[in-house]
Amino acid sequence: MDFSLFYFANNDTEQQDCYRLLLEGARFADDHGFTAVWTPERHFHAFGGLYPNPAVTGAAVAAVTKRVAVRAGSVVAPLHHPIRIAEEWSVVDNLSNGRAGVAIASGWHAADFALRPENYETRKSALIDTIDTIRRLWRRESVELVDGAGESVSLTVFPPPVQPELPVWLTTGGSPATFELAGRHGLGVLTHLLGQEVGTLAQRIAKYRAAYQEHQGDGGRAHVALMLHTFVGTDREAVRETVREPFSRYLASSFDLIVKAAEAAGADGAAMTRELKNVSEEDRRFLVAQAFDRYFETSGMFGTVEECMAMLKQLADAGVDEVACLVDFGVATDQVVDGFQHLARLHDTWRAHTGR
C-alpha cells in the first residue's frame, strides 16, 4: 500500500506564507518514498480556499520535487472546458517530466457553478463523456469544435504531454454506483471515510474491482486511493489534544459549507436549510464534538506509529491501494512539519512489515 500527501486546507487564519506547508510537505514526500502529492479544486469559501486551481499548485509541487507524482484531488470537470483541463495538465506533465495525474469530480456546490452555470444540471450525466474527451486529447487526437466565426475546426492541444496516457481517478464520497462506473470505464477511484465505514468501503471496492475486471480484463490497473485525515505522534492522548481544537474548527467550517450548499440549492434544499439553520449553537458544538470523536477513533489516522499500523492493516484488508494522508486540517504548520518525522517512520514501518 502506497502513501501520499493530500491537501484540502481550511484557511481560517491569516498567514503570509500560506503555501509553506504545501511546499515543505511536497519536498518531504519526495525525499521519503511517498507516491504522490494531491491538491484540490475549491472555490468561494475558506474551506479549501487556498486551492482554486490544482494545476497551478501542481506546477508549484512539480518545481520543487523530482520523483513524486503530482495529482489533482480533484478537478471539478464541469467547471472547465475539457481542452483547458488537458492543456493545463499537459503543462504539469512536462514540468514534472511525466508525473501528472488527475482525479475528476462532478462537483456538488451550486455556488461553484457560477463559473459555468449551464453545466450544473448535467454535471453528473456528462462526466464520463468529458473524461473520454480529455483522454482523447491527451493521446494527441483531435476534437471537432465550433470557432468564433461559427466554423467547424479540428483542434489538438499543446504542449504534447510526456506520458502517453493520463492517469485518471473518479472521485466519490461513497456512492456504490460511482465505484462501479469507475470500474466499467477503467478509472481509478479517489474516496474518503467522511460518509462510509471501512467495512462498507471494502464492499464497494470489491464491486469496483469486479466491474473493472469484467470490462477491462487484465489490460488495466485498478487503483483505489483513500483520503485520510492524519497526524502521527508519540502519544495518543497528546495527539488527541493537538488535533482536537483545529480539527473541530475544520469540521465546523465544513458544517457552514453544507449550510451554504443547501441555500444554493434553492427549493430543493429548502428543508435542509431550515433544519440546519435552526440548529442552536449548543447543538452545533455537540454535533462537532461527536463528529470529532468518530473521526478520531474510526475514520482518521491519529495516534502513535503502532496504533496507526492497525488502521493501515484494516485499509489494506479492505482493498485500499494508497493512503492519501490529509495533513492540513488546521494544526499549526510547524507542528505538522515536526510531525512528518513520525509519518515517515510509519511509512517505513509499514514497508518493512509488508515488504513493499
Describe the role of every protein-language-model region:
Residues 1-17, 78-149, 188-190, 194-202, ...:
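Flexible, glycine-rich active-site loops centered on histidine and acidic residues
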Residues 1-64, 69, 164-166, 341-342, ...:
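N-terminal beta1-alpha1-beta2 module of alpha/beta enzyme domains
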Residues 3-7, 37-39, 70-72, 100-104, ...:
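Hydrophobic faces of well-ordered beta-strands that scaffold small-molecule active sites
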Residues 7-19, 75-83, 163-174, 230-233, ...:
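Active-site mouth loops of central-metabolism enzymes
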Residues 16-28, 88, 172-180, 305-314:
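Short, acidic/polar
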Residues 29, 33, 41, 61, ...:
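Conserved, mostly hydrophobic/aromatic
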Residues 36-57, 61, 76, 108, ...:
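Glycine-rich, proline-tolerant flexible connector loops at the mouths of alpha/beta enzymes
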Residues 121-157, 199-320, 351-354:
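An alpha-helical appendage that flanks or caps ligand/catalytic pockets
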